[in-house]
Amino acid sequence: MFLLHEYDIFWAFLMISSVIPILAFIISGVLAPISEGPEKLSSYESGIEPIGDAWIQFRIRYYMFALVFVVFDVETVFLYPWAVSFDVLGVSVFIEALIFVLIPVVGSVYAWRKGALEWS
């Protein structure tokens, strides 16, 4: 027999969490000032009129370096709890962590060999 009243808290939470964003959009649409004009369509750079082309393209090299940084940064975050509890954990967890470290290292060596990390 299913007791549906056990899920009352879930349904209440679901309703409230659905209504709050909808209300936020409705209230902001009602209270926001409506302004139209040429200033609305101009680009804004810290209150200064942009000189030249405001949109520049970044080279893909910057994204490659950022991606490598993020991969190793996330890996460091995951390795910290392992390093703190290293003495309690067994050899199998050490091997798993070693594999976890070797996968990004092999990927970065591959990228380095292909020239993806060259700055020039």
Swiss-Prot record:
GO terms for cellular component: chloroplast thylakoid membrane; NADH dehydrogenase complex. The chain crosses the membrane at residues 9-29, 64-84, 88-108. One of its GO terms (biological process) is photosynthesis, light reaction. It catalyses: a plastoquinone + NADH + (n+1) H(+)(in) = a plastoquinol + NAD(+) + n H(+)(out); a plastoquinone + NADPH + (n+1) H(+)(in) = a plastoquinol + NADP(+) + n H(+)(out). Keywords: Chloroplast, Membrane, NAD, NADP, Plastid, Plastoquinone, Quinone, Thylakoid, Translocase, Transmembrane, Transmembrane helix, Transport. Its EC number is 7.1.1.-. Its main location: plastid. Belongs to the complex I subunit 3 family. This is NAD(P)H-quinone oxidoreductase subunit 3, chloroplastic.
